[in-house]
From Swiss-Prot:
SMART domains tied to this protein: GAL4 (SM00066)
Highest taxon listed in the record's lineage: Eukaryota
Subcellular locations according to the entry: Nucleus
Protein's UniProt name: Glucose starvation modulator protein 1
Species the sequence originates in: Candida albicans (strain WO-1) (Yeast)
Low complexity compositional bias, start-end: 253-270
GO molecular function: DNA-binding transcription factor activity, RNA polymerase II-specific; RNA polymerase II transcription regulatory region sequence-specific DNA binding; zinc ion binding
PROSITE patterns found in the cross-reference section: ZN2_CY6_FUNGAL_1, ZN2_CY6_FUNGAL_2
DNA-binding segment(s): 20-48
Family under the similarity heading: Belongs to the ERT1/acuK family.
Role noted for this protein: Transcription factor which regulates nonfermentable carbon utilization.
Region listing for Disordered, in residue ranges: 63-92, 250-270
Any single biological process term in GO: cellular response to starvation
Length: 566
């Protein structure tokens, strides 16, 4: 048994530079002299020898005899391709530098037009690399970007580029669609804060052509440069939509953005929509990458801006006829075409027509009504566009002083930053859903709304319920009377909770909502806000917001209970 050392001996002893074979096998503390103390004590001093350390494969074989000859006898060194020009270097300093590249040639495949011939062990060769050829290590480390000196100008769109390793590093199509929520949020906020839109540019933009303005949303020349592009297609389009709050432009027709069935959409995103790869002949890419690009073009939805004539809000004077038509044509009972799901059948039309809450509240009064009557999915992008239009009205105005305009503009920018912090997550959660999934989410919302309306009837607190966009879907009669409104007037058309708040309360609400929209699963918020009556009087309320989330943990319904402060 090994003698137990005292603390002083343990402190004074020093490890040996290299242990002997016996001490190494027995895990003993060896000494520097030979034979060591352990071998002398055990009468095996004649066999006390230093342990031979293993050589790392990529190191030279100067310390181990025969290492080079063993490597040259391996089958890998017998593989040959076309010859490479070599030159003999007489310098001794070059000899030591060339030893490592020759030994490490097995780790990387040689170029197609080169090979390594068997060299005599007495000679040291230097491989001549042409100055124009790029080392493979640089190609592996450089991100997929195009050389700006070989870009095609927009004046000659029919000119083709010869894609070579000297002027182009082949981009990976998937690299255009990868990003994180934190990075994309930071990009959006930086873009929104750095862009300075003046009143004159807004007025001139409002009177110009719609297609031209859609291009101006990217840059004044109609193309985004490398520094102005986000790393996500969704964030590029998201920034365009948020920037529309300031740029009053005539937007393109919105297309379904939260479905994956966009094959018939001619406005789907493609790599050619980016300015830095425009006019590139993508036929020069290999076939697998072209298939990936085509798959992304067919599967990614397109986020467009604004209203068109057929989707614009109707005149309030014709609301009765308009909703009667919606009741007759768009919401029907169970069909008679055999058994099957009455909600999802062959006659169901997935449209973006808006159905006001006054109709849905009267149509779905029990849980069985959700299954016996046809249900339509809710088109959230159109609701966000209506919110955009409302925010421009609330924080706009030409009869204000420059100080008041600047104050309203600063509040608008705060709201923009808060929306940009959570909206990309909402899009990412719903972008791969099909129409049936959206119907399921709407059915979940309507089913939860039935329970909350029954609870509101048993509760004495004035209550308002709205979607995550702020669109009101239910209000109690006592709350409507406090605000000098009719509940039917607030539900017969698209109305937002922000229409009933003052400017500071709107900013406070978005601050609170942004904190619980993503990540934070807190379901109850207590605060105090000011509400506007129909006669423009302000009433201060203390309120409690209850958040109901969907299966993606995204806010689905916000239930606000208000108590006036006397």
């Amino acid at each position: 048994m090994t003698k137990k050392l005292t603390p002083q001996e343990k402190k004074n002893r020093k490890p040996a530079v290299r242990a002997c074979v016996f001490c190494h096998q027995k895990h003993l503390q060896c000494s520097n002299e030979r034979p060591c103390k352990n071998c002398v004590k055990r009468n095996i001093a004649h066999g006390c020898q230093d342990i031979v350390r293993k050589r790392v494969k990529y190191l030279t074989g100067e310390g181990v005899p025969g290492a080079v000859s063993n490597k040259q006898s391996t089958p890998r060194k017998k593989l040959k391709t076309s010859p490479v020009s070599t030159s003999v270097s007489p310098m001794d300093s070059v000899k030591s530098e060339l030893a490592t590249p020759v030994e490490s040639s097995n780790h990387f495949p040689p170029p197609m037009s080169s090979s390594v011939d068997a060299l005599p062990t007495t000679q040291h060769s230097a491989i001549e690399i042409p100055p124009n050829d790029q080392p493979i290590s640089d190609i592996l480390e450089v991100p997929p970007l195009f050389d700006s000196s070989h870009m095609i100008s927009s004046e000659a769109p029919e000119t083709n580029i010869t894609l070579t390793t000297q002027n182009l590093i082949t981009p990976d199509p998937l690299s255009f669609h990868t990003n994180t929520v934190s990075n994309t949020t930071t990009d959006v906020l930086n873009k929104l804060l750095n862009d300075n839109y003046e009143t004159e540019s807004i007025l001139s933009a409002n009177n110009s052509n719609g297609d031209h303005l859609l291009g101006m949303a990217h840059t004044s020349s109609g193309h985004l440069s490398n520094g102005q592009q986000f790393q996500s297609n969704y964030l590029n389009e998201e920034y365009m939509m948020l920037g529309d709050i300031i740029l009053q432009s005539k937007q393109a027709s919105p297309s379904p953005s939260n479905t994956s069935t966009s094959e018939n959409n001619t406005n789907t995103l493609s790599p050619s929509s980016f300015g830095y790869i425009s006019n590139i002949n993508f036929e020069d890419f290999n076939q697998p990458k072209r298939k990936v690009v085509q798959k992304l073009k067919d599967s990614r939805p397109f986020i467009s801006l604004g209203f068109t004539a057929d989707l614009a809000p109707h005149d309030n004077n014709n609301n009765t006829d308009y909703y009667d038509d919606k009741m007759t044509n768009n919401i029907t009972g169970k069909t008679e075409e055999g058994p099957g799901n009455p909600i999802i059948n062959y006659n169901t039309k997935f449209t973006t027509d808006y159905v006001p809450p006054s109709i849905t509240n009267n149509l779905y009064k029990t849980a069985s009504d959700l299954y016996s009557k046809e249900l339509k999915n809710f088109y959230y992008p159109l609701s966000y566009h209506a919110l955009t239009k409302l925010l421009k009205v609330i924080f706009g105005g030409n009869d204000l002083s420059p100080e008041e305009k600047q104050e309203k503009r600063s509040k608008l920018l705060i709201i923009l930053k808060l929306i940009a912090s959570y909206r990309p997550t909402f899009i990412a959660a719903h972008r791969d859903l099909i129409q049936e999934d959206l119907l399921m989410l709407e059915m979940t919302l309507q089913r939860s709304l039935l329970d909350y309306k029954k609870l509101a009837e048993l509760n004495s607190s004035p209550t308002i319920m709205w979607r995550r966009t702020g669109e009101i879907i239910s209000i109690t009669e006592d709350m409507a009377l406090l605000l000098e409104h009719s509940s039917f007037d607030l539900l017969k058309e698209r109305r937002f909770i922000f229409e009933l708040m003052d400017d500071n309360s709107i900013v406070d609400y978005f601050n609170l909502f942004a904190n619980i929209a993503v990540g934070n699963l807190k379901s109850v918020i207590q605060t105090a806000i000011q509400m506007k009556t129909k006669s423009s009087n302000l009433i201060k309320f203390t309120c409690v917001f209850t958040i109901k989330r969907d299966i993606f943990d995204i806010p689905m319904i916000v239930i606000g209970q208000f108590l006036p402060i006397v």
